């Protein structure tokens, strides 16, 4: 396929300035073979989508962990003070789980207005790891900001990687941020 593309480009006297792929391991070797001197970059949307998927997975696991802490209640109306307190706790935790599920998109949305920030704060109250996830997502979006140059983005990426390393639980979730192909996704920032 790439050989035919190169032939078609040369037949029309067109020049290939760059190639963008989805980050699959299938592309680099054939691209080097056919287009040796053409820069190859990774599509930023695929990387952000993978990070978003990991963040939503972390939100889901936090929600499941919260649901697991709900007290088990016997059937029927709670009669003792302890049973009533357990019922209130269960109702509160179930409401927080439902709110986390309903508003999970707020953890990965690029821009939040004031109302959405308040909702996110209310939903993630008592779960500092989720608040940290949102702060990290804002840094991820800042890395891919079109207004900065590649070197600035690489500096932001280094800062982001150091921040993620400080939180051991988040390090496993966001291991995509340590991928060596991530730097290749930032080459588009110097394009005019």
Functional labels for PLM-detected ranges:
Residues 54-82:
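Internal, charge-rich low-complexity segments
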Residues 1-37, 57-61, 76:
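RNase H-like nuclease fold core
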Residues 17, 21-29, 35, 71-192:
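Acidic/histidine-rich catalytic cores and adjacent linkers
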Residues 36-60, 64:
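Inter-helix linker motif
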């Amino acid at each position: 396929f790439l050989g035919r593309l190169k032939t078609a480009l040369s037949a029309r006297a067109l020049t290939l300035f760059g190639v963008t792929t989805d980050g699959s391991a299938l592309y680099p070797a054939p691209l080097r073979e056919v287009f040796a001197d053409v820069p190859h970059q990774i599509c930023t949307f695929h990387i952000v989508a993978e990070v978003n998927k990991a963040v939503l997975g972390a939100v889901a696991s936090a929600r499941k962990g919260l649901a697991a802490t709900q007290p088990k209640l016997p059937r029927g109306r709670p009669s003792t003070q302890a049973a009533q307190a357990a019922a209130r706790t269960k109702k509160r935790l179930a409401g927080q789980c439902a709110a986390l599920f309903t508003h999970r998109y707020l953890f990965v949305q690029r821009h939040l207005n004031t109302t959405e920030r308040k909702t996110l704060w209310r939903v993630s109250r008592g779960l500092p790891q989720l608040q940290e996830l949102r702060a990290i997502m804002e840094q991820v979006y800042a890395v891919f900001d079109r207004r900065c140059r590649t070197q600035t983005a690489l500096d932001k990426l280094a800062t982001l990687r150091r921040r993620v390393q400080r939180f051991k639980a988040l390090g496993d979730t966001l291991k995509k941020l340590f991928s060596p192909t991530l730097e290749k996704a930032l080459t588009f920032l110097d394009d005019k």
